[in-house]
């Protein structure tokens, strides 16, 4: 996604691809595109939006703002749809990095999916929630001894090896624990997905995985086979995020299965018979804006499964089990962030033009993606109806940073005012999980809504939480 052009130019004078088309009527500003907003979200005749039967005005009054609101049915339905598309929950590993708390871990468990974690903290939350360790896979490019030890002691299903150092480290830890740990090797296949540079992870110049092109991946595989306490059960690859087509996956599968063929040729069918998994990672895209059009999950799954079957048959191998790791595709669409408008300011940027800034009570501390990735979002007035004409505005946060932007350019009702509630769609992935305490602003609460009821999932941080980290007397 491209950043909005910088510089003091009036927003309405910009003819940039990222500036949305001007709505033709006030009613158009009120529309909530079903491909972007949660499944159980509707706007009433009074303009107030409800999610799963709960008005957002009630949520804001009870829990405060900013507030993350999760449509539980939306999250669970996406779990079921993806599991059905890929042949069962055991082949779908929810990527905890998108968003994890104990409640989410329980939902994922109840829907029969497996779970990917990337740190000791994510592992601890999953185990605290009672998630079965045997269905957990541990990722990460720099797993510490403590993290690997905790994983082995918990009995996790798989560890994805990311370096040769880690092979020796994990072999020693598993040996000391008296277990044989199932592992996959993460292979860098040289595919750069058509996405933002910072989240494209399978090209060569990056910190993840072991290169196929240089032979590092095969060398790592040889080292795993030489250990006493590791069992290689498959190969892993991840080519990026927010991907809308299968072209990159097809190339990745071709190269990973080609490597699997070489491994079988070198070590023999008997010794490699347990290598039954090809994990193509995550990266399945979602709609952030009304015109976004990712493929239906069943269509994407059918294509990926056929690619793996075809590539395996081409090299004379039995079809391995295809594993995928969706995070955003499950967590992203069913959550919105509620903000309260604090100030509205028209700033002159030339003798004849101005820019409207709508400031809300959160910002880059609860959603860094706009600043970090130039991400785009759909934002709407959700607390009332308005027949005012559209005005192009920039929704910004309250932090001491000029780049603190929630939505760079969006059309709002011209009468938007302090006290109004703004909803930002599709914030369930990589918003709370990447949140911070910048300016010592406390993290928002998270609530789940279902069947007309709302319940607190994560409470709002307080000043007492901030002060609890202080060491008295120093």
Swiss-Prot record:
EC code: 4.1.1.20
Keyword terms, alphabetized: Amino-acid biosynthesis, Decarboxylase, Lyase, Lysine biosynthesis, Pyridoxal phosphate
Binding sites annotated in the UniProt record for substrate: 328, 369, 373, 401, 430
Stretches that traverse the bilayer: none
Keyword Lyase belongs to the record: yes
Superkingdom field: Bacteria
Signal peptide (residue range): none
Sequence ranges of Basic and acidic residues compositional bias: 9-25
Catalytic activity: meso-2,6-diaminopimelate + H(+) = L-lysine + CO2
Sample GO molecular function, one term: diaminopimelate decarboxylase activity
Active site: 400 (proton donor)
Keyword Acetylation belongs to the record: no
Residue numbers carrying N6-(pyridoxal phosphate)lysine: 97
Pathway named in the protein's UniProt entry: Amino-acid biosynthesis; L-lysine biosynthesis via DAP pathway; L-lysine from DL-2,6-diaminopimelate: step 1/1
Cofactor: pyridoxal 5'-phosphate
SUPFAM superfamilies: Alanine racemase C-terminal domain-like, PLP-binding barrel
Region of interest: Disordered: 1-25
Gene Ontology terms: biological process: lysine biosynthetic process via diaminopimelate
Binding-site positions, pyridoxal 5'-phosphate: 283, 325-328, 430
Physiological role: Specifically catalyzes the decarboxylation of meso-diaminopimelate (meso-DAP) to L-lysine.
Similarity remark: Belongs to the Orn/Lys/Arg decarboxylase class-II family. LysA subfamily.
Subunit structure: Homodimer.
NCBIfam families: lysA
Protein's name in the database: Diaminopimelate decarboxylase
Biological source species: Mycolicibacterium smegmatis (strain ATCC 700084 / mc(2)155) (Mycobacterium smegmatis)
